[in-house]
């Protein structure tokens, strides 16, 4: 059964401006270590940051918590499997919140076009 759905859209230029201003500090602020490893290998680092930022926002909207109630931006992560499919991962604290809410897993879809990033997340009940 579906626990919740969430979506987020943002302008790539917004993330570009933030990355230009804060650089590596911004990267460490929003990405989990597993994501930073993939970020460093990315051909388009700002696009990577924007897509992951939007995916995190969509995921916490699907949780119904936003970045509050024990959730922080690095408590949810998005990594690509060997096929390139984005998958949701959790920090220990993020997993604890999921357990409390009865969330068993989820899916995320990402798209970009014309300078916009779109993320859609579906979380499943445990």
Identify the role of each PLM range.
Residues 1-126:
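Core catalytic alpha/beta fold that binds nucleotide/phospho-ligands
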């Amino acid at each position: 059964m579906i626990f919740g759905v969430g979506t987020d859209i943002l302008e790539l230029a917004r993330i570009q401006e933030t990355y230009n201003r804060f650089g590596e500090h911004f990267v460490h602020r929003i990405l989990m270590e597993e994501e930073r490893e993939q970020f460093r290998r990315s051909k388009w680092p700002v696009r990577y940051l924007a897509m992951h930022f939007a995916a995190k926002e969509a995921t916490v909207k699907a949780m119904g918590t936003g970045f509050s109630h024990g959730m922080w931006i690095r408590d949810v992560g998005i990594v690509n499997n060997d096929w390139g499919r984005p998958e949701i991962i959790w920090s220990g604290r993020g997993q604890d919140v999921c357990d409390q809410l009865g969330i068993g897993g989820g899916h995320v879809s990402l798209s970009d076009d014309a300078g916009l990033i779109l993320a859609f997340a579906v979380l499943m009940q445990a």
